[in-house]
């Protein structure tokens, strides 16, 4: 990414120089190219004048210019080219300009997005710019690919780009004007510019330098950055003053600095807010220009398009990258970087980025672009990637810094901040979606945005804004230094780190601040960087400082050596810095300077989510995200920062090889991360954004090997990080809090590194290789700078850190110590496992993030689906993870630093944690089970980390932290995650403690945020679970805290990370309302319940499967036993036959021989006694077998128990299974065993099995019996019991035998054998019985468990939908359903169902259960459709229930069967009532139904209780209505086809005034009443008496109406008594519809959208006068009997009546149907007659026949009466009127003839005579006068005669027009309607 970024940057530089083909690219590419050129491309291009590396720096520096709106041209000699580039950029990037952008356009020449480039092209870089084109082409390949068609119009395009940039900026949300004006482009570019043709830029840079405290460094950096820092002089002065104060205050001791910072922040914030409002336009413009593609959400359209383009490269690069980039947009950082396009590059990376960051909104877009750039840069150079990564940080820092002014202005209100927060949140969640997400960001619901951004921004942002403005800058710097130190430290090891850290702050921070910020100084950037300056650019500055410093330092050393590669490193470093800064910022945000931090956050917010993401989120992302997060943002933004920070990046990269790898690799990943970035965006806003991204980053690292895994990729870095971190912690250790802060920063850095390495395992090695060197180089020099910066920043940072660290940092530190030791190992492990892991991650950066997220937030899920499945979740989660990572990283690098700052107890836990983490990391990379604990913890947060970290801290510490957080507010959020986790997770967490600790806050926070987003639900559930595992208390505390702190969007984890934001949010969280929090808490609670219920379901399911296995095994054993029994039976038979043979032989011998006789006699005697003995003994053995139980249940109970016990032993049957069924078993056993089983045992089993197979088991019996023995207690019993029992009989027989002859001995032996075998057989039979019994019981328990699972599913469903049915009803139904199968079952269910609502409920006796619903019983259910009762219109009685039909269901019916039954009934009903299917209703129209008091919603899980209940025979079906955004319920009630109903509603909603005209009796009034009810329901207003006002124009005059409407209009205008204003006015029976339009328009003069709906009806055809018929205010709907809805209404109505009268009368349904079908024919015949012989308004409507009775006899009498008394008189009158008006139009036909011929009932002939004739109208006495009368009539009526057809034609035309637009409208309307509904 970085590589491509760099490339892009160069082309952009080219563009600015006037490169013709880069112009389009310029908006994004400009910044990028500027950055790249600064870093790489600018080196050559800008170096042109200045020379190689120096050149780029100089160019950069030169580019920084302060311009006045007036001095656009002077400012940028190449203004036009710049403009072109800019325009193109904007065009490419942004679709339109905001007002601010337009203002910027005024400065277009100077404002060209390529400010840096433009200046080059214009003056200093004119030539360079031209040369740049080649570079730009070369470098911006990726950029080109991202922003295609941008490159070509380099010069020319740039000018357009400038305007476009404004377009980009245009999004009003980009308060870029100030930022834009103070557009520190890129450090490198600045330097280059200063050398080349500093001209205006140079002047600006010098000014900035002069203004900035760090003049020298800024100067160099200014040259380097040379980004055109277009600063409004006034703004610059103000900002510089503030910044100087901030810087000065930073030099003070931490406390005074903090106080001063707070004051400065407040002042700056006020100033900025004032300037913001004035500059907002210009700022936006500038920002837009600079941000061009990425500027803000405003830039979204363009940004989206460009982003899309960029997304492409990223996408191809990271797979999911592209979408993520867009998601990245969400991360403000990304967005900021995006702006980076021109400004970032000009500012050179950090500053420019930050400028862009200012727009915060563009962040999301910027993020995308930046990411894209990063990705592209990555392509070019891993270093670049890192640079880009750093850029993110820088962006955060710088943009924040620079943008702080804007941001501050922007942060005019916390509401802006919250808005941004929301936007960020939205981005976060939406970013996952892709570039469209970006677009949607602005449109994303505020809640979502708020979720993410607010979460971050809430605490972090507000605090950040308040304190961070200054504090954050300090913090940022501190953290940045720390991070840089960290980065370098990790690369350089402890010494390097601490030194580096320090140096970097001085060198890097100062340098970067000085140079880079110096330019910003014009903007007050340096101050920003320092706390002093932070106020205006609080968010940006800190990040910028940190990121910039790190990047710069790195960039300086590496800038020359590494150039692009180093740039990447720098970016990485910066990013880390940013991360740290973000962290610090968080802390700072928590601090008083909240105003400033907030402003920046607000700025972001103002920009809406993308900016927040950029500003705060970016920082957090960058910092928190560490590599991943940053890279994410970097991906979008870092490219530019890369330019600015190339040198810096180098350091960073070298500092963190792993980081670099992530940079290169991560860039891609980061792209993926961009989605997380969205989350991150939110995170960023909160300052937790970083963490969130970090979470993503960390996740991968954790996944790799927890930290080790990640670290291995960046192993070198980790080592350095560990030591570096340690050192940084001390640096930050002014006090313990400082140390904590530092440790945190270090950890973050480390995490970042980890992240990075993991993020880009493959590139990590390369990057690491180069980075370590670069890092060291950069690290050493930057360390001093950093230290200095740190000193300034530190106090705030410390304060922030104190807060943050107190929670996350302290613990992280302690855990870090342990971790530190382990880090190397982990890293080593990582190297081992990191490779694969990285590969995993690398392949799909997004997936990696997902993995991270999944592993942390959902370890289990992670296991199951590393990448895509969780990706959605993961992105949000990733953000959380990033945050977590930030924390984690801190522990990693904190290990050594942490010991000093953190309590010893914490470290001990951490040691364990590292190990665990190590394992976990490995597991993460590969095994689904990263260790259950790990998984859980991670699940929680990667979340586990948070928990672990906190636990590591030690519960006490956690508590303390919590308390401190609570006090601090902001810290609390950080702590929150920690605290909640530690209690429950102490042990496992401690193992993971360090990382978790660090990560936890982020992860926790992120998860919350994530939860807010799409991921939230899952994550929340997981988090809840994790929390629960960690400790329910913890999770509960965590959640509420998160919610409270961050609003309702922050997850506990999120809260932790967003604690700063949260605090800030508390200060200015106008958006986090208690209600939202409550909702969030409720959601969390419900999610928790859902999770638990899901877990239960899973557990039960697994149990069920286990049971199924058991049952299968049992059945198998039963089969075996059966076969054994058969064998035994066969052997027994064999023995019997042998015995008989023996007897016969003995008898034979007796006869033959006396001895033989004696023997035979003995044998005979023996045989006679043996059977009895055998039987008795058998019983004895039986008894002995079942000894204990035999008394009560005979042997069956005992044997069953013994068998149970033995089987358990033998088969290892699940003890729980048995115990779970214990109660059921005992109860079932009692009755069953005693009765049925013993009987079976004695009778069935023995007999049946004995004879079965006598001969098969002689030998087998012996074998079988042992096995049986082992398997069952009875067989054992036989052994043991037989011992005593056999002996007696045995001995007796033996003695007797001895006394008798030898043959008798043989006989006795045979007898004893037979007896033993028979005993064995008996035992086996008993075993069989027992096993059968057990099998039965198992089946029963399985059934019960199935019921339990069903109940759980139902409960799950209930939880998903809402608080489900009362548990009271649930219990009752459980027994019922269980009773279905058998009393025993119901009993068992009641006993074993721990799930059962209550035993009392399930106390139904078995018999009750059976009687409730016998399995064979059939229940007839009556299905009705119930309409919601509405009493809106007086005297309007409407049917409440519509009978559909009956359905017979069995007593065993379940919900699925019942659903099908209801569907079938409804389908049959519709087919009967509407055979032509014109209504458009189907089973899809059913929303749900209720039986008894249980409601079943079809799209949800069925209720827990089974549907069968005694005495229930009614099912009430509800159809989809307003709540489901459907009109099916209304269609069903009115019988008007669905498309027409939707059309009517759409006309009403669109025009608010409708007149229905048509013959009387066509249902117009009925329809108006229904429409009025619908509108009332849709409005959501309380139904009052006057909500619908009805005027009957027959009874009331037009004057009354006019007076009423005038009063109404006055009432509405005064806005008094609005509640009494009717929503709908019904005008019934208008006599002259034409005049009503004028009357209403004249009287109702209030605003159109406040007017009530007006629906009129008229029986007269509307005369289409010019004033009325086509009048715009009223829409006409003509009802004709010839078309729907009137012509089909009668058929449908009568058929419905027939169905509803379902009774015995309908025995002759066919005849009745024939009669009812005749009625519409009759009506149509009469209608045709009246058309011929009457006037057009004298027609007969279907309502004449609605009173038709159902039943042939009733119908007969009704019809004869109707015909004679109603129809004939009406026809006569109509005919008379027709003759008067038209004369004789046609030959007269008596309608009665047709009626008599077609009478449908059987006895029709008798009734024909009863029907009256219709006599033809007689002219009578007037016949003579009739001709003249006719003539006069004809004379006077030609117009009416002619107009009638014309009218009809016009009406038809209008109707046709309405219908023509209706398909459109319906497709639009449907969504429209649904949306409005």
Swiss-Prot record:
Sequence ranges of Pro residues compositional bias: 902-913
Tissue occurrence: Broadly expressed at low levels. Expressed at high levels in heart, skeletal muscle and placenta.
Composition skew (Basic and acidic residues), residue ranges: 476-486, 503-519, 555-566, 581-591
Annotated localization: Cytoplasm, Cytoskeleton
Phosphothreonine modifications at: 159, 534, 544, 572, 1006, 1170
Modified sites of kind Phosphoserine: 90, 142, 152, 194, 199, 296, 308, 312, 362, 391, 452, 474, 476, 490, 528, 541, 648, 750, 754, 760, 797, 808, 1000, 1181, 1265, 1382
An example molecular function term from Gene Ontology annotations: ATP hydrolysis activity
Region (Disordered), start-end ranges: 1-59, 114-225, 294-336, 386-839, 892-989, 1172-1204, 1244-1306, 1359-1383, 1810-1843
Main location: cytoplasm
Tagged with keyword Zinc-finger: no
Coiled-coil features, chain-numbered ranges: 255-280, 731-756, 1072-1163, 1303-1362
Entry's family note: Belongs to the Nav/unc-53 family.
Assembly description: Interacts with tubulin.
The protein, known as: Neuron navigator 1
Species for this entry: Homo sapiens
Gene field: NAV1
